[in-house]
Amino acid sequence: NSVHPCCDPVKCEPREGEHCISGPCCRNCKFLNAGTICKRAMLDGLHDYCTGVTSDCPRNRYNH
């Protein structure tokens, strides 16, 4: 079994100095910059963007 390079296998959390393990707003163990598109617009015409502080891709706050 290979260990994920971002993951501390004992604690099951990001290694010291790293931000994240995986997710649409995580790349190379770091959060993507705020404003990076993490989900392209579909029917509503609004993209979803990374916040720079989480690996999740939050829904565009202007979506109804």
Curated annotation (Swiss-Prot):
Keywords: Cell adhesion impairing toxin, Disulfide bond, Secreted, Toxin. Pfam families: Disintegrin. A motif (Cell attachment site) lies at residues 42-44. GO terms for cellular component: extracellular region. GO terms for molecular function: toxin activity. It comes from the Eukaryota. Disulfide bonds join 6-29, 20-26, 25-50, 38-57. Gene3D superfamilies: Disintegrin domain. It is found in: Secreted. Residues 1-64 form the Disintegrin domain. Expressed by the venom gland. InterPro entries: Disintegrin_CS, Disintegrin_dom, Disintegrin_dom_sf. Belongs to the disintegrin family. Dimeric disintegrin subfamily. Inhibits adhesion of cells expressing alpha-4/beta-1 (ITGA4/ITGB1) and alpha-4/beta-7 (ITGA4/ITGB7) integrins to the natural ligands vascular cell adhesion molecule 1 (VCAM-1) and mucosal addressin cell adhesion molecule 1 (MADCAM-1). Heterodimer; disulfide-linked. This is Disintegrin.
